[in-house]
Amino acid sequence: MPTLLLSLGSNLGHRATTLATACDLLALALGDRGRISDCYESEPVGFVSEHRFLNCAARFECTLPLADVFARCRHIEKLLGRTQKSHNGHHTDRPIDIDLLAWGDTVLDSATLTLPHPRLPHQRRRPGLEAHAPQ
């Protein structure tokens, strides 16, 4: 069963509530309670904003096909107010962002998804990402 690593972030609205809701919805959608890291704050990456991000990481054991996982993550983003991944190719403030960081040992580079995520080495150095640690 592949291990799914996700990075979640929010820099608009009630960030902590949004992240908690996203994690609950992910557990339901993926069929696994998962392991969720502590939250931490960060500056936006790739754009300037006065709004800092609240972030966490999540680890799930999942039997769903990768395409279904990707679609369910996008659906949860939409449910929580996300309208687009970027605006004219530029990142913007958002109520929720769910990034797939890794799916087991899968290596993929498509128009919609790159695995492992290009920022995964950077993400692993973040404090509080104990969700990445082996069980």
Q: Can you annotate each of these PLM segments?
A:
Residues M1-L30, I36-E41:
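N-terminal beta1-alpha1 ligand-phosphate binding loop
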Residues G9, E61-T63:
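Solvent-exposed residues in well-ordered beta-strands and their adjoining turns
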Residues G34, V45-F53, L64-Q135:
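Flexible, gly/pro- and Lys/Arg-enriched active-site loops
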